[in-house]
Regions:
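Active-site-proximal helices and loops of the catalytic beta/alpha 8
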Residues: 1-48, 65, 73-74, 79-86, ...
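Short, basic, glycine/proline-bearing loop/turn elements
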Residues: 51-70
Length: 177
């Protein structure tokens, strides 16, 4: 049985351009003291607010200049996807996260809204959202095409915390096969 690792807060803080509480190292289970491969990590779920929604509504306007700028938002979300999908272990991509869906998951404040959500295939007609989708696609291809990089015997260095903000965040993988 797999455990869940909720990285929503760190993901949202990073994407909104706030360094405080922006730790995304938990996308890799051993960084949280869990066994390799024991945990499905995620940035979004039915219980958590969508990252794109939070960037749009609460993003750091001093850093992002214009939080409603679709291209800038999709670029931040693509960078977050890279942090999530280059970390070994199972991941969950939730309901059009790969297209930057900004539909809220809440109703009446903080109550979870589990009603069916709209399906926006027309998002693929937006070049910025299509770019985000392509980023997810390429990152998934990278994982499938290089299983040794994501194996238990691979060596991983993740620098995706608030203290890595100024120097730049990265994940370094060394082939384990």
């Amino acid at each position: 049985q797999l455990n869940w690792s909720n990285i929503n807060e760190g993901s949202c803080q990073y994407a909104m351009a706030f360094s405080d509480n922006s730790n995304c190292n938990g996308f890799y289970a051993p960084n949280y003291g869990r066994n390799w491969g024991s945990t499905v990590s995620y940035a979004e779920s039915h219980d958590e607010e969508r990252v794109s929604y939070k960037v749009l509504n609460y993003g750091n306007s001093a850093t992002l200049r214009n939080t409603s700028n679709n291209g800038q938002r999709m670029t931040r979300l693509g960078s977050l996807a890279a942090q999530m999908l280059t970390a070994p272990g199972p991941k969950m991509i939730w309901q059009f996260q790969e297209l930057g869906n900004e539909q809220t998951t809440k109703k009446n404040g903080n109550e979870n809204d589990t009603d069916p959500k709209g399906i926006y295939w027309n998002y693929l007609n937006d070049a910025n959202r299509k770019g985000l989708y392509d980023s997810y696609s390429e990152l998934c291809w990278l994982r499938r095409s290089n299983p040794d990089l994501f194996s238990q015997s691979a060596t991983i260095t993740m620098k995706c915390t608030a203290s890595d903000w100024s120097a730049g965040r990265y994940t370094h993988l060394v082939n384990g096969g």
